[in-house]
Amino acid sequence: MSRQSLFTPALGQRKGLISHTVDLVRALLFDRRYFWHTAFLLFLGEVALSLLVIWKIPYTKIDWPAYMQQVDMFLAGERDYSKIEGETGPLVYPALHLYIYTAFHRLLPSIENVRPAQFVFLGFYLATYLAISTIYYLAGRPSNGGHHFPQVLLIPLTLSKRAHSIFLLRLFNDPIAMLIFYLSVIAFQIGGRKGWRLGCVLFSLALGVKMNILNFLPGLLVLLFQYRGIVGTVEGLSIIGLIQFLLPAPFFFSKSNPYLIRAYFTSAFDFSRQFLYEWTVNWRFISEETFLSRERAVTLLAGHLTVLGLFAAFKWSPVPGGTLRVLRKGFSDPLNQALEVSQVPAYHIPLVLFSANLIGMLFARSLHYQFHSWYFHQLPFLLYSGAGWGNMLTSVLIWVTVQYAWETAPSTISTSAALLAGHGAMVFGLFFHGMKRPSSSQKSKAK
């Protein structure tokens, strides 16, 4: 027997083992049947890493003391929202934010000892991961020309130093608002009358924590019209508006003074508030004078509305006949949905909402480091949906560029320019390489 023949079985077994391992890894990363297997493995890794972060890295004192000082004034009986303030300035967040941090104030053994609060925020962090995983999974349901969002997209969600810092070390309110928002997206994806109503309730609660949730509102308006019709849209907006009025009720009805109503809304939803140039992440490459100018604010608003209009007109109604057909159907039959659910893929709902938010980020007057949480968990979804120009290497390059800008502190001229370029590239990618509108002939063939 030759020497070569002696080793042939062993070599064959080794090749078989390698092939089996490659197949297993491929299945864990891309096969929909193993989506939750991979998601759970990553979840366990996040638990271990997050506990290590809390244990080893000191808490960063930024807004937590100010939140607690604002709560102290609220508990002391102050009901004029414009007079509630902390060491970082006046209270500029809606009422649910104040109630949540009041609960922290009451339940924690000491507001100076933030470690228990960090474990609560660890719960928020892990719940957010599970919520966004659910959104990706539901978006990948194989129906109506849809496609699977592979679980490999979940890996980047575990790689951000900035995300761990925002949730676990700084205890900002942004993660709370985003968690509630993601729960609303799941409700919208589940659908049905109850799903959309519950989604609107959750959306309004998220808005009751922080007004950045308004970035998603243009997309939600489009979706409500498409899935619920005119009457359903009015119903959804009424739910959102009613909750926004009920949340601050203790401030309105504590004294019969109409001024308190105006004081609340002008403080909690102050669209004219100036941002500090020293904290900007996305506009460091312009002068402070230009940064603070009214002309720049007006230009950004005009650009924001224009791009939203373009997406609403050409991208957010991916059915034969497009937006005009959806509008005609909606206005001719206001009691019913303006498009057939069977006409759009499962990823339509999160794609519209997330792209509306990305457009808002592109035209934001200023972004601070905690605002990273407004869209970090959405980036792999968007890049896979066209924001990466349909190319894996381009997607990776954009993701790395954007993350590098957020991880660099303080911001520099180059990192701000890179962040703006990354946002612009993603918006252009979504517009030119995103969801395609099927032609009537394609639709008929599909049938």
From Swiss-Prot:
Enzyme class of the recorded protein, top EC level: transferase
One BP term from GO: protein glycosylation
Documented EC number(s): 2.4.1.258
Cytoplasmic side: 56-83, 140-170, 226-232, 318-343, 401-411
Lumenal-side segments: 1-34, 105-118, 192-204, 254-296, 365-379, 433-447
Compartments, as annotated in UniProt: Endoplasmic reticulum membrane
Transmembrane segments: 35-55, 84-104, 119-139, 171-191, 205-225, 233-253, 297-317, 344-364, 380-400, 412-432
Keywords from the named record: Endoplasmic reticulum, Glycosyltransferase, Membrane, Transferase, Transmembrane, Transmembrane helix
Listed Pfam families: ALG3
Entry annotated with the keyword Membrane: yes
InterPro entries xref list: Glycosyltransferase_ALG3 (IPR007873)
Function: Dol-P-Man:Man(5)GlcNAc(2)-PP-Dol alpha-1,3-mannosyltransferase that operates in the biosynthetic pathway of dolichol-linked oligosaccharides, the glycan precursors employed in protein asparagine (N)-glycosylation. The assembly of dolichol-linked oligosaccharides begins on the cytosolic side of the endoplasmic reticulum membrane and finishes in its lumen. The sequential addition of sugars to dolichol pyrophosphate produces dolichol-linked oligosaccharides containing fourteen sugars, including two GlcNAcs, nine mannoses and three glucoses.
The protein's name: Dol-P-Man:Man(5)GlcNAc(2)-PP-Dol alpha-1,3-mannosyltransferase
